[in-house]
Amino acid sequence: MKNDTQEPGIPMGYEENFPPVDMKWHANATKRFASPFVDNPHDRIDVDAIILSHAAVACGWTIRDFYEKPELGIHCVCYASELYDLLPVTHWFYSLPWTRELGLKLVYKDTLPPISTGPIISEPGDVDKIRVVDKEELKKNFTQQEFYRLYDYVAKQIPMTLVPISYGFDLVGAAAELCGVENFIMWTFTEPEAAKKLVKTYTDTSVNGAAGLADKYGMAMLIVGSVLANNDIFSDESVEEYSAKMMRYYVDQSFRKGAGPQVFYHLCGNHETDYKVFKDNLIWSPFTVFHVGYKGKNVFPSKLLKEEFGSKATLMGSVDTKLMINPSPITVYNQSKEQLLGGRDAPKGYILGNSCECPPYTIPGCMHAMVKAARDFGTYGTW
């Protein structure tokens, strides 16, 4: 029997803290979500604000709760998606999956996702000490067990929102954490073979993680990005060599091992000129979403995104993440409008998103401004 006098807090049984999903809303959101992939426009252009810990904050918990209690975190995402009228599917992740298995120690913080306590190697010769972790070993270890537990919870409690997702995420950035970001950047100039081997070791481990998820659930959507590898740090040539080619390798190898066919490519940060190297390097399945955050200091224009990648994938345009904590919903609305007008007629469909993760303390009025703009300028049949 449930103890109604229990003090606020969450043991397990996270589902007891949330009302059931409104299935009328969910049915409409599902048709809307499928629109770009089945060429059957429904309702309006979708909004994917890349909600993570904001979902927990919006429901009254903390950033730390979101990451330390994945089942709670993903249920918060489910509830926040209905609250804001976003996507009908759930997700939960952080930026350093599979790194524990490679030897990195992660710690939880009150205001941050899990972060590394520091590099585990410091010399190029040490790269050989880090080995690829195979699929069966990963299945027994922390990251894969965490995802199994997470998706089993979703399958039981909110099954209509389940999409098993495996994260390669930032192949270059995660690999760089193993030796220290400053060391890694230097090695790309002085010890390029060591730097490349480190990225490949992390990538192969991530592929095995995707395969392990596909073994259990029959599929695994892939999310992979270029975050550290951007024009603020690297040349176009280096972004291509270290990131774009490895993203292709990650998707190709994951597909061959049963993952996919859904792919989300997330180019975070400044990709002012290096965006050009991705078109001919990436693998484009019929269920691909492609997203670029910034071009220089400004959000990447959806018009340019459409011109360059509209024939390749469903596109996700960007609203500047910084605006989401600025007390000016009209600014968010106007930028959303500009991006929608630039990308809404993309041949394979368009989604409106943030340039990066929705800030934990996003102003609800700013979130509403994005969705309102999508209704006002993204309703199918009105342009």
Label each region the model flagged.
Residues 1-54, 61-64, 76, 87, ...:
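Active-site loop segments of alpha/beta catalytic cores
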Residues 58-61, 102:
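Short, glycine/acidic-enriched capping/hinge loops at junctions between secondary-structure elements
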Residues 52-57, 96-98:
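Short active-site-proximal "capping" loops at secondary-structure junctions
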Residues 68-70:
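Ser/Thr/Asn(+Pro)-rich, low-complexity disordered segments
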Residues 77-105:
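Membrane helical hairpin/interfacial module
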Residues 95-136:
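A contiguous, low-structure linker/loop signature
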